[in-house]
Amino acid sequence: MRLTTEGLEASRLLKKGREELAERVTGRYFERRPQWEKSCKHARQKCAEDTRHHLDYLSEALSLSRPAIFADYVVWVAALLARLNIPGEALNTHLALLRDTIADQFATAGSSLAARDITMHYVDGALAKISQAVPEVNCFLDGEGAFDILARDYLEDLLQGNRRRAGQRILAAVELGSSIHDIYLRVFQRVLHEVGRLWQCNRIGVAQEHYCTASTQMIMSQFYPKIFSTERKGRRLVAACVGGDLHEIGIRMVTDFFEMDGWDTFYLGANVPVSGVLQQIAERTPHVLAISATLSSHLQAVADLLAAVRATANPPRLLVGGRPFNALPDLWKDIGADGCAGDAAEAVAVADGWSV
């Protein structure tokens, strides 16, 4: 991993002072913008929460020597706030206060000048990036092919709260000859990406987003009699979301693809602690461990888990995936993995390549 001493020092100080920094930044923010606190009942609480998120992503970026982790997160926040009609100046002010407050706290804590400077550099880089135009996120369901139309109709059913019709639509497509692989990748995956985009655009709420995800998981389960009937090939997979990550549907799809490829799989679900993963590796002796991370704030947890697995007597191959790895294609090398995959089909292809 391409780590730096000053980055690790800065990350450690941010984690140690997280709560105090959040409170100090929030206090300074409302000293400058008292009208914002008056206009929203929970403004101070929300500001402190947002500050903690900023600190978490900044800490991850510093610990992995990856300024793009924080910069990309800030651009995402800027896009979200723009669609909520919150002026961009609010985020600029917030980040500038964050930078100055960190500098003050680092000086008080006796940090090295290098640790302070690299932190300021990361924040200033993110500020410079959001001064550019915030890119639009295009619809994931464009096109007029059969699967494009099916995906749009399926999403419309879910947004109307009609899970039964959505499921019937998918089952009918399979009966007419569509493969489960295509349904997963060309319908479910794209629809869930579109659901995320709609949430970011403030067109649906968290409850609708969760409903769409839960409904899709339920519909996926109807395919399990077929998925688990594939001829076995004598290879084993353990799959899980890293501790703290509650977004499990992606790694569930990956696990199902391995099952359809003939692997014996052991799916551990979301938010699995290191001890739980190590226990399963000892008991199942898998050939591959697949770990998913949805947010960049979980990357250090992934690195810690992979290091713990590598320290075991006979570690499996380590495969990672998730949004942070898609955004930074070579990140998996720095984090200690053996490979990375952008979707379920690629994950199986990578793992099958290791068995040759």
Task: Tell what function each PLM region has.
Residues 75-78, 96, 171, 274-282, ...:
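Amphipathic, non-transmembrane alpha-helical secondary structure
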Residues 122-128, 132, 240-241, 249-264, ...:
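Active-site-proximal alpha-helical scaffolds that flank and shape metal-associated catalytic sites
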Residues 104, 141, 163-164, 172-251:
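Long amphipathic N-terminal alpha/beta scaffold segment
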Residues 255-260, 266-333:
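Cofactor-cradling patches in redox/metallo enzymes
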Residues 324-356:
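Peripheral docking tails and interdomain loops at the edges
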Residues 235, 263, 316-317, 338:
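A structural micro-motif
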Residues 1-96, 100-174:
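Core of compact, soluble alpha-helical bundle domains
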